[in-house]
Design a protein with these regions (language model features):
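A beta-strand edge to alpha-helix "cap/lid" segment located at domain peripheries
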Residues: 1-27, 35-126
Length: 126
């Protein structure tokens, strides 16, 4: 993976890694202090919990389709807001969701952008 990916490219890689269930591809994209708010339950999970759920196949994504995205950059921080449609399973139960998301990226000392926070909400307009 290039060290010079934009936040938008890291976002694309994040969705691709989720769909592939590829933890080794996902881990370099995530900040060490990464947190995610689950779209279905509203629960907060850290990097270790997300990667474990994917590695153990508790969480699987059949597809994550990006519908739209807009971004703002503020120095060493970038915020992307977008819409996705996704399908997968959690603990064996199938799910589908149309979501709006906010992803916050930070640029580290090594100049690489990493996803620091992800928040998903149901898209009522979908």
């Amino acid at each position: 993976m290039s060290d010079h990916l934009s936040p938008e490219q890291v976002d694309d890689e994040f969705f691709a890694a989720l769909t592939a269930g590829d933890v080794s591809r996902l881990e370099p994209l995530l900040d060490e202090r990464f947190l995610i708010v689950d779209i279905m339950s509203g629960a907060v999970a850290d990097r270790a919990a997300l990667t474990a759920a994917l590695a153990e196949r508790v969480l699987e994504f059949e597809r994550v389709e990006l519908i739209e995205r807009a971004g703002r950059h503020y120095g060493e921080t970038a915020i992307l807001v977008g819409r996705t449609e996704m399908a997968g399973s959690f603990a064996g139960a199938a799910f589908t969701a149309a979501s709006r998301y906010t992803h916050v990226f930070v640029r580290g000392a090594d100049t690489r952008w990493r996803l620091a926070s992800a928040q998903g909400s149901h898209d009522r307009e979908a």
